[in-house]
């Protein structure tokens, strides 16, 4: 999945080269790189500052940045690259001439994605694992970033087991417009321990959509055993606000709209926001 961004290979660069004045015989010099809004799964902007920068430079991000496009405000002093962040952790960014000579290199860092779940009871911050559970992580972030979880409920609360949310609104009305079900990622080495975040599903393994749950205790019985007992896919963990989760778990529950274990007073997820 290595990405070699060959600037000259992108059709948009022909116009950029013209706008930048083309090659003037001076060697390009990169004096610094600045990255703006670098969050996993989102569009990042990379500013390459220097002198005599040309659009036939090569940039290698080792697959960390995909779908590259150049902003129209690029010039010979600043090349502005937009791309989608596809990896986390440290990665090298190397700028090369068209002949392959390295003229600048630096190491950039993309943090693990985090999402803030905002409720009246308080905020819960979950950290996701796109390395071991990329399908579940990308699915969850897709729902988060399109605002799907706004005003949904923690609709299933079972003390000493789980709190579950992400699929219903007030009155236990099922929310529509879910994306297609995703492939189960339960056999990836992540366990349903206290505080872990996992995808809820039906009895069919590959049926998870928007609903998720947080484990209140070590529920290793929910882990993958074999193909006949595939378990539930963990894709993250609570890193802040487990006390809020425990407070939700202490709320009285009953039967609402034919559903059991429903909090008698709505516990509303007012907003889910990607914070990193």
Model-derived features: where do they sit?
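Sec-dependent bacterial lipoprotein signal peptides
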Residues: 1-18
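Cyclophilin-like peptidyl-prolyl cis-trans isomerases
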Residues: 20-276
């Amino acid at each position: 999945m290595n990405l070699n961004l060959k600037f000259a290979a992108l059709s948009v660069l022909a116009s950029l080269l013209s706008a930048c004045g083309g090659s003037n015989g001076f060697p390009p010099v990169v004096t610094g790189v600045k990255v703006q809004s670098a969050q996993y799964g989102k569009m990042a902007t990379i500013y390459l500052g220097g002198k005599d920068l040309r659009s036939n430079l090569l940039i290698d991000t080792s697959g960390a940045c995909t779908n590259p496009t150049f902003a129209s405000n690029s010039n010979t002093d600043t090349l502005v690259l937009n791309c989608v962040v596809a990896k986390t952790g440290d990665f090298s960014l190397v700028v090369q001439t068209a002949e392959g000579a390295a003229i600048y290199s630096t190491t950039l860092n993309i943090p693990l994605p985090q999402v803030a779940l905002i409720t009246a009871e308080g905020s819960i911050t979950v950290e996701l694992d796109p390395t071991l559970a990329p399908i579940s992580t990308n699915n969850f972030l897709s729902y988060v970033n399109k605002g799907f979880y706004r005003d949904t409920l923690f609709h299933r609360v079972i003390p000493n087991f789980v709190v579950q949310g992400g699929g219903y609104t007030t009155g236990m009305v099922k929310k529509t417009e879910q994306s297609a079900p995703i492939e189960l990622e339960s056999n990836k080495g992540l366990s349903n321990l206290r505080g872990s975040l996992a995808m809820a599903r039906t009895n069919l393994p590959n049926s998870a959509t928007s609903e998720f749950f947080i484990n209140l205790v070590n529920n290793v019985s929910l882990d993958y055993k074999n193909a006949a007992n595939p378990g539930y896919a963990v894709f993250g963990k609570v890193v802040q606000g487990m006390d809020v989760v425990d407070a939700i778990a202490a709320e009285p529950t009953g039967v609402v709209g034919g559903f059991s274990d429903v909090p008698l007073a709505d516990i509303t997820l007012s907003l889910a926001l990607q914070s990193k």
